[in-house]
Amino acid sequence: MTLGTDRARFESSARPLVETQLSTVAPALREAVAYALSVGGKRIRPILVYRAARALGRDDAPALEHAAAAIELVHTYSLIHDDLPAMDDDDLRRGQPTLHRAYDEATAILVGDGMQVQAFCLLAAAPGLDADRRLAMIDVLAAASGFPGMVGGQYLDVSATGGALTLDALKAMHNLKTGALIRAALALGGHAAGAPARRGHPADPAPALSLPPGGCLGSAR
């Protein structure tokens, strides 16, 4: 399987799950979500979800598409909010107008908020898993995207604006801001595939999978 094959799988199988969930949403809001999801992107996180499951021989696990869509929604929402005037104030994302420029700030905030919530709705409805496993997946994504992870890293980034960071501080920031979701992608793929969890840490199958921590990937992005 190539990266292109996994990327095509996401577009044909995981992304439609999001579109189905939005079928009753106001057309203009649905259009803004579609715009945000269509602006380029390598789909690295959903690809890692697929690759983790494939390493376990469970590339066909029914929950994989929900996990892949969920983590890409969280990643996309983070970019939308990161681009806002209160954060990085970016006009372009991957060569295209950022969402708040293509639409407006209020729409961008609402789309980001909605994407974050929909990610957890997808995990709560992931097929082929028992309730404990779904809760473990929700726990993984919540920790990776919240204060102990991505949000905490973004705060360190914003707080350092105009100042100088030591190499250790820079590593810590990227370990949270980017590395946390990389680790979560691998863990979600493991959960979707039924990987055994570490004793005492039911939300974390990574040790059983011998997965890398993701911090260096976060620093090298």
Regions found by a protein language model. Name each.
Residues 1-21:
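N-terminal amphipathic/basic leader segments beginning at the initiator methionine
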Residues 19, 23-221:
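Mg2+-dependent prenyl diphosphate-binding active-site environment of isoprenoid biosynthetic enzymes
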